């Protein structure tokens, strides 16, 4: 049986009727239905949870004549199971008991208090500390795609628009945890999403409404116009924002009070980084999908999670305009000069103010998060004083570390020094903050002292020496008197229980105390919740101030991390110039260099790279394993690091304007999308020749190797010509086709270089030593047989390969002529004129009368019709 809302409710028990009504409101979501100490799932939800979580599936009783299939998870273990479901891409609605069990007639009232989805997770245990969890909405309007994204745990809100070609690049750049799309078919969007592993949620198309989105954005940002955010002209993004904000508010069950700023990111403002570039340069993930070793893992020595998230954003969103990068370079230099390590040490104890602020707004913050916030706010003055003021950026960030003092004051007064982990455990509100709470706590905590005092007073009053005042859970508080002393009992004693050897009584004073004591703990917890809510209420107006502090701390942490990396790894400050050039002196691959240092693999060999207006392409040849790909990647990484505002691994660096980094490296089949090695190679190459400009950096590694030799050689030559002559992009073109070393002879802006190697002749055969140096001119040979020997190929196989190679080389040398790949195409043979062309050639317009001209026109028309039939 499924949880079908259309099923007649009258056939079900009252509780199942309630459940089915809730399930009908969340048909595509797993519903966790609170029942006492468990969250239960029913019917198809239970079967699915059993499969995903490996929890027990059972059935209990009947409803509508069928067994009720169910599975449950304990309340105390909710976060664990919730995390597993969200990681599997599931969305979960949590239905809590909101009614009073004591007064309920029928099932206690329940309602969904929040919906947890992969893109709207805010629970600390379910979030990655160093990655922002983004919810993205995408919709198409004519030729443009509108994008709107939200980091619910950080309060970030962004908009953009792009064309079909850039869509996959935006998905790679943002890395969303969940994508909202409308329920219309869109082949391009489906294709772009197929390259990701993100959770996909379809929403009705009417929710993606431009006017609604504009209105919701204005309401969210509390403005009358979006002009102040430069967001008036992105109507497709407004439509995406309508669905995004509605969905986020629905999942949280409340307004998003902490979202108060908006960033509009335009593709023309950012350095273009297509998905292949993210993948091939291993920016945030290795080619195997691991988090390290990557460029980000090398850079990220941040002290806080929010610093790590800021650093990741800088890396994946580098700007074409260099203003922000220059400011960061200046700040890094100042921190390297003085104060950087002191600042990093001060940041060590800073809490995640960004996420705590979001959880305050969503009223999900835990007591110990507030104590962490309090400690951070109290440490800000000393931290602020330690920030160097030698750069404008650092001075501005330091100035933002001055939140209103009443925030820390409130937290000091209201929250205990060491509160319980959860509010429900009590002991959260500080003693002295509320007199009523202190009294209730006093009753509960001083119960034993009161009983001893009452016992002493009653013994003295009655003269009964063995009188005892006690408590048990069945009868509550009582005064116990043995049967032999009953005649001394005062008149105000009321009999509560008769035992064989004693009588138990209660007095008005003890009854009054009992009423207070038995309910004191419950009332104290209720009072604490009320006071805690009051603290959160008081913090709501301070969310913007806390957000500013969080952003400043995150930026300082990221800058201090980059300064530490620059100092430890011996990086230099790049110079930006207006002339077209990429000039790198003694450049290194940062990740490879670090790995060599870690593993004791020797020193990295640095290399120069010079590209300018008259030198736009390097044709790179040399042996496999010689370092061609490493050299190409290191040039791209130096350019990217400079653009994000980092120092770079080089002795010196001058960079002109760069608008994109395109890469075609690697030969792995894309089996998931039914693309062979060669098809993937050509698809990526096509995207590059269509998208690269004279300001782009292009890496082409071994293009054409996925097909036959002649096909591959012809295509490689044509692609090189296109990039050199038409795109005019800065290009590093590595190839195993030695015929392409003739390319620079007819292309003046191209130059041959090679990675060097040396041979040594031993009794075991020719050995090869890779020197990893980039030197002028083409390589003399590829050393493929020597590399095969290093790989462990059998000696007989190597002898056969060497003999075949020598024969082929001799055959090539004896060839009388070679194909010129770069000559103009040969002229086509002359073609015999058609009857229509001959008739047209015989017409003399200047000698025709009007009548003759009309006849000629009809004759030509007739010949044309006949030619189509043939």
From Swiss-Prot:
Sequence positions that bind ATP: 622-629
GO biological process, one term: mismatch repair
Signal peptide: none
UniProt keyword terms in alphabetical order: ATP-binding, DNA damage, DNA repair, DNA-binding, Nucleotide-binding
Gene Ontology MF terms in the entry: ATP binding; ATP-dependent DNA damage sensor activity; damaged DNA binding; mismatched DNA binding
Keyword flag ATP-binding: yes
Any Gene Ontology CC annotation: cytosol
Family: Belongs to the DNA mismatch repair MutS family.
Function: This protein is involved in the repair of mismatches in DNA. It is possible that it carries out the mismatch recognition step. This protein has a weak ATPase activity.
Record-given protein name: DNA mismatch repair protein MutS
């Amino acid at each position: 049986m499924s949880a079908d809302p259309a099923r007649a409710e009258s056939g079900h028990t009252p509780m199942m009727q309630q459940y089915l009504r809730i399930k009908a409101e969340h048909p595509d979501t797993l519903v966790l239905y609170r029942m006492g100490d468990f969250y239960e799932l029913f019917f198809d939800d239970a079967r699915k949870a059993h499969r995903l979580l490996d929890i027990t599936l059972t059935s209990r009783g009947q409803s509508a004549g069928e067994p009720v299939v169910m599975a449950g998870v304990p309340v105390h273990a909710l976060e664990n199971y919730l995390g597993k479901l969200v990681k599997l891409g599931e969305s979960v609605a949590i239905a809590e008991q909101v009614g009073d069990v004591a007064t309920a007639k029928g099932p206690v009232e329940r309602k969904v208090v929040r919906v947890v989805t992969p893109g709207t997770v805010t629970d600390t245990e379910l979030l990655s500390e160093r990655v922002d969890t983004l919810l993205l909405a995408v919709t198409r309007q004519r030729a443009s795609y509108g994008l709107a994204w939200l980091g619910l745990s950080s309060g970030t809100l962004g908009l953009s628009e792009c064309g079909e070609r850039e869509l996959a690049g935006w998905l790679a750049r943002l890395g969303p945890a969940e994508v909202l799309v409308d329920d219309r078919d869109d082949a391009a969007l489906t294709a772009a999403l197929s390259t990701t592993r993100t959770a996909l949620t379809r929403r009705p198309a009417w929710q993606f409404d431009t006017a609604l989105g504009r209105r919701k954005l204005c309401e969210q940002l509390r403005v009358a116009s979006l002009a102040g955010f430069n967001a008036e002209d992105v109507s497709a993004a407004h439509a995406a924002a309508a669905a995004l904000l509605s969905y986020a508010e629905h999942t949280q069950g409340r307004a998003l009070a902490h979202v108060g700023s908006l960033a509009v990111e335009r593709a023309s403002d950012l350095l273009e980084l297509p998905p292949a570039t993210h993948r091939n340069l291993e920016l945030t993930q290795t080619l195997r999908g691991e988090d390290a070793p990557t460029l980000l893992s090398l850079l990220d020595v941040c002290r806080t999670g929010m610093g790590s998230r800021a650093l990741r954003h800088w890396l994946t969103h580098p700007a074409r305009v260099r203003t922000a990068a220059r400011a960061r370079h200046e700040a890094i230099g100042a921190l390297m000069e003085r104060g950087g390590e002191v600042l990093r040490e001060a940041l060590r104890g800073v809490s995640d103010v960004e996420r705590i602020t979001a959880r305050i707004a969503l009223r999900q913050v835990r007591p110990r998060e507030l104590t962490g916030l309090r400690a951070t706010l109290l440490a800000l003055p000393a931290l602020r004083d330690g920030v160097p003021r030698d750069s404008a950026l650092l001075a501005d960030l330091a100035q933002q570390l001055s939140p209103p003092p009443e925030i820390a004051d409130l937290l000091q007064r209201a929250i205990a020094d060491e509160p319980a982990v959860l509010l429900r455990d009590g002991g959260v509100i500080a003693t002295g903050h509320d007199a009523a709470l202190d009294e209730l706590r006093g009753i509960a905590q001083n119960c034993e002292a009161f009983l001893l005092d009452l016992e002493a007073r009653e013994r003295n009053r009655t003269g009964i020496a063995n009188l005892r005042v006690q408590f048990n859970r069945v009868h509550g508080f009582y005064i116990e008197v043995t049967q032999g002393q009953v005649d001394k009992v005062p008149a105000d004693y009321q009999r509560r229980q008769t035992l064989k050897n004693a009588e138990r009584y209660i007095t008005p004073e003890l009854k009054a105390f009992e009423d207070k004591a038995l309910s004191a703990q419950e009332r104290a917890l209720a009072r604490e919740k009320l006071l805690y809510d009051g603290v959160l209420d008081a913090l709501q107006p301070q969310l913007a101030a806390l957000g500013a502090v969080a952003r400043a701390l995150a930026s300082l942490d990221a800058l201090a991390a980059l300064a530490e990396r620059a100092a430890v790894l011996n990086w230099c400050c790049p110079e930006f110039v207006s002339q077209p050039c990429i000039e790198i002196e003694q450049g290194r691959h940062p990740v490879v260099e670090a790995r060599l240092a870690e593993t004791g693999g020797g020193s990295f060999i640095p290399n120069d790279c010079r590209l300018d207006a008259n030198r736009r392409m390097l044709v790179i040849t040399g042996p496999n394993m010689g370092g061609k790909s490493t050299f190409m990647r290191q040039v791209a990484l130096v350019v990217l690091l400079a653009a994000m505002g980092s120092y770079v691994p080089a002795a010196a660096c001058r960079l002109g304007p760069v608008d994109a980094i395109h890469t075609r490296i690697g030969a792995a089949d894309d089996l998931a999308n039914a693309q062979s090695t060669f098809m993937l190679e050509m698809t990526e190459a096509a995207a590059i020749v269509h998208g690269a400009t004279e300001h782009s950096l292009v890496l082409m590694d071994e293009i054409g190797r996925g097909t036959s030799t002649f096909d591959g050689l012809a295509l490689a030559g044509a692609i090189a010509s296109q990039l050199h002559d038409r795109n005019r992009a800065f290009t590093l073109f590595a190839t195993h086709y030695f015929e392409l070393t003739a390319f620079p002879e007819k292309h003046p802006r191209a130059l041959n270089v090679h990675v060097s190697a040396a041979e040594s002749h031993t009794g075991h055969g020719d050995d090869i030593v890779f020197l990893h140096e980039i030197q002028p001119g083409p390589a003399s040979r590829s050393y493929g047989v020597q590399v095969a020997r290093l790989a462990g190929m059998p000696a007989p196989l190597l002898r056969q390969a060497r003999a075949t190679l020598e024969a082929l080389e001799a055959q090539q040398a004896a060839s009388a002529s070679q194909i010129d790949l770069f000559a103009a195409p040969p002229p086509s043979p002359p073609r015999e004129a058609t009857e229509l062309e001959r008739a047209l050639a015989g017409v003399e317009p200047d000698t025709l009368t009007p009548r003759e001209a009309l006849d000629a026109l009809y004759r030509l028309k007739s010949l044309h019709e006949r030619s189509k039939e043939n």
